[in-house]
Amino acid sequence: MNKFELTSAYKPTGDQPEAIAELTEGVLQGVPAQTLLGVTGSGKTFTIANVIANINKPTLILSHNKTLAAQLYSEFKSFFPNNAVEYYVSYYDYYQPEAYLPSSDTYIEKDLAINDEIDKLRLAATSSLLSGRKDVVVVSSVSCIYGMGNPSDFYNNVIEIQQGKAFSRNVFLRRLVDSLYVRNDIDLNRGNFRVKGDTVDIYLAYADNLLRIIFWGDDVDSIEEVDPISGVTIARFDAYKIYPANLFMTTKEATLRAIHEIEDDLHKQVQWFENEGRPFEAKRLQERVTYDMEMIRELGHCSGIENYSRYFDGRKAGSRPYCLLDFFPEDFLIVIDESHVSVPQIRAMYGGDRARKINLVEYGFRLPAAMDNRPLKFEEFAEMAKQVIYVSATPADYELIQSEGIVVEQVIRPTGLLDPIIEVRPSHNQIDDLMEEIQIRIEKNERTLVTTLTKRMAEELTEFLLNNNVKCNYIHSDVDTLERVKIMSDLREGIYDVLVGVNLLREGLDLPEVSLVA
């Protein structure tokens, strides 16, 4: 399928038809930047969905936090149920980056926990983009500007099979291993495959079902999609593309070349430290990099291998890393949601990363090449963003300047809702006052959002409300990404009456059942 099919029970009303027509015309005429200035509740997401359906281009929707990205993903999934709507955010449930604090001589080791489900969704996004189909929407956080593998290496490891075509089983198994699938005949998990005679079962890294390939001699006899629990055949295929199990692909030749280049740069950097009269840093760097190279030779990877990504990608010093934007075709659209927040966030990513890494390089923990494992600079992102629609109720000067006066306004709400009444109340007895307001909402079967200043305050207030028989939960950055989505869904369904959070509840969340924000 290569055409977007918009599915909705509603028709554009209010300011939406005019906004859709203007934005569509702008994109089709090649206008580089436009701004959709829409008040809260005016249906900006529905407008953008209509524009995407009209222009029929692969589209990146960029959001400033994971929670809002998850909500947008859910909305676009409902608008385009028959198209490829993907989700691409950071796959870390917990991430402590490597750092060095010279003032206290403290080295902080990198520590992380990867969410397997989000890793699957990220792989699904890149696989859809490289499949060549046009009807792809990827909803992403700022993760899309962070470094990842070379798309050419990823694409070169795609395995194409056809029913009835000659393909040696042993060659096929070797290709699977090259694509980073792991053989496991006992416990078949995502990214594994098992072999039983002429039957090969592959648990695709980016899907929920197994792919079963049955060989007859050196020919592919059948290709089936199988339910991993029941074993029932769901679908049969004449041809199939198997995408790699990891976003970071390389070859043995590239690995050997990278090791050689790393050792050359190590020698130069050690020499520099010694000439500067810093033998301790020289010794530290020599030991750390030598150990990493031994690990890569023996196991194919090491802790912190991303700091050597420039060598594996074959990039020059200072050049930008590959990122999700490289997986899109030349002609694609970027929609930046809540742009007044998202644009400054994109701008800040490079500086924050550089400030941390500069100490690691300066004190001999990493080679200078570690500086090239980074997010895009804002200028690099702007250069790659050939066509952008900024979406905001309060666009900043940057968006307005970039749009050169092309501002599409959407101020009439299709629902006829008025702006909410804002009251400022004294902090004296604020909890008692809050409890009274919550009870009023509960009696009307409505929901309440409560914002606090800190994560600890959110947790303590939630505990207090629960002790007072209020169905309540909290979300903040320590709550897993997918768990946040479930909690917000539970709020809408009435499992909770109150949701407590910090500033991530501030922009863009669409919760029609909520009638009070305190």
PLM regions and their residue ranges:
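ASCE RecA-like P-loop NTPase motor cores
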Residues: 1-518
